[in-house]
Every structure is written in C-alpha cells, then in structure tokens.
Amino acid sequence: AMWAESWQNQSYWLDGLEPLGNSFEKITTNVDVLIIGSGYTGLHASIQIARAGREVLVIDSGEPGYGCSTRNGGQISTSVKPSQGKLEAKYGQDQARAIRQEGENALEWIEEFIKTEKIDCSFKRCGRFHAAHSQEQFNILVKDAQKLSKQEDIPVEIVSKQDQRKELGTDLYNGGVIFPRHASVDPAKYHRGLLNLAIKAGAKIAGNCHAEKINKVLSAYEVLTSKGKISCKQLVIATNGYTSKLTPWLQRRVIPIGSYIIAT
C-alpha cells in the first residue's frame, strides 16, 4: 500500500493539542481592522493591533492556522536562498550584509518574543546542517560559510564527508556546514500560543470564513465573505502562499514554494 497504517489527514504537529471546536465560527460585521489570514503573520498583526486598543477581526478560509503555520518543518534559520556571493553581485556588499543581518535579527527577536510571552513551543537552538550533494557544492558552501564567519562573525562549523556520519548517520552527502545558532520550534504549539495571545488581547477570530471580494468604499472597505459582509476601516492581507485572485497585485508578487518533511 502507498499509505502507512498510521497516515492521517492532518498535520502530525497537531497531535496532543486540543481541537479548536466551534468557538471560532462567528464574525463581527463592523471592525476597525480586518485581517485576512490567521497564520503567523495575521496573528502577530492582530496581537499588536488589539493591544493598541483597536477592534480587530481575523478571518480564515479554513480553521485558524490550517495552512503552513501548523504544517511546516519547524526550522528557524537566518538563511536566504541566494548565496552571500550572489547577494553581493546583485545588491553590493553593504546591502547584502543588511539582508543577512535581517535574518540574524529575526532569529534573535523570535527567541526573545517566545521567552517574554511564555509560549510553550519547544524552542531550541539545535543547529542546522547544510548538506552538499557534490564536491563542487561543498566547496561553495565552505567558501560562503568562511566569508560569513569572517565578515559577519557568524559561527559556522565545516564538516567533511569523512566526519558527517557523526552528525547525520549517513555517508550519502559530500560533507556540509553547520550553523549552530539556528533553531527549531513546534510550529503548531507556536501558532496555538499566538492564537491564545490574540484572543487574550481582545482580537476576534473567525475560521471557515472565505473572503470572496474586496470593495473600497470611500476611506474604508467592505469585504464579502462566505459568512456575510464585513466593514472595516483598515484591511490587512496576511495570506502569504495562499494569496489568490482576491488581491491580484499581491498575487503577482508571491511565489508559493513547497516544503516537505518526513515524520518518523
């Protein structure tokens, strides 16, 4: 059979969490701020807005957090896809460093946020291994890592093919680089923590509420949803990889990327 007996049609990260139930079904028809998307982006925005004293509603086409926020690999790194060399070639050394620094800042920020807000989500600085599929790729990884270490004081560990079994238990790759400060988190627990913070701050959350059309009305907005019309003074689009024709301008600028992990 193609599917294992333990296969289930929901994220394994959700195991052990209480089901959300029907407590997120109602909508508020008139709010200061409406947020479309209840993932990390939408909930973080709702927490700050609600704490500032404004009435905010978060809607989602599925259950809160049904998308990538509870189905990702849980890795937290400082990395961006292009290498340091490619960033410098396109943007120059100063801008390339600024882009890299944003990643460093984000990792420090989320650790402090989790600690300050007391979110139980198994945050851990476990390190991350970047494996090389060829000797050529290994040479590139090492060159970039040494440059990052020298220019930005980022800790790195070079692992040869001979030593990688100590890290991965396999000889498949051609060595790699360890970034020891990279972290991991239980993404579903982190999302649930954000959800609880948003509710505590006074935000309203409505799941299974699909946004179908956005109309601009003078200086405000009317959003037609599967549960009725919602009026708001300000609108936040927090749909990320699920961005659709609802917002064509944003859709043209977002590229969904698949990410896969193996649960063992």
Question: Which residues fall in each region the model found?
Answer:
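Redox-cofactor binding/interface segments in oxidoreductases and associated redox assembly factors
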Residues: 36, 78, 237-238
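Glycine-rich FAD pyrophosphate-binding loop
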Residues: 51-71
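Short phosphate-binding/catalytic loops that engage adenosine nucleotides
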Residues: 54, 153-154, 203
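Helical element adjacent to the flavin cofactor pocket in flavoenzyme catalytic cores
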Residues: 146-147, 171-233
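Central helical "cap/lid" subdomain
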Residues: 225-264
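N-terminal Rossmann-like FAD-binding beta1-loop-alpha1 element of flavoenzymes
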Residues: 31-58
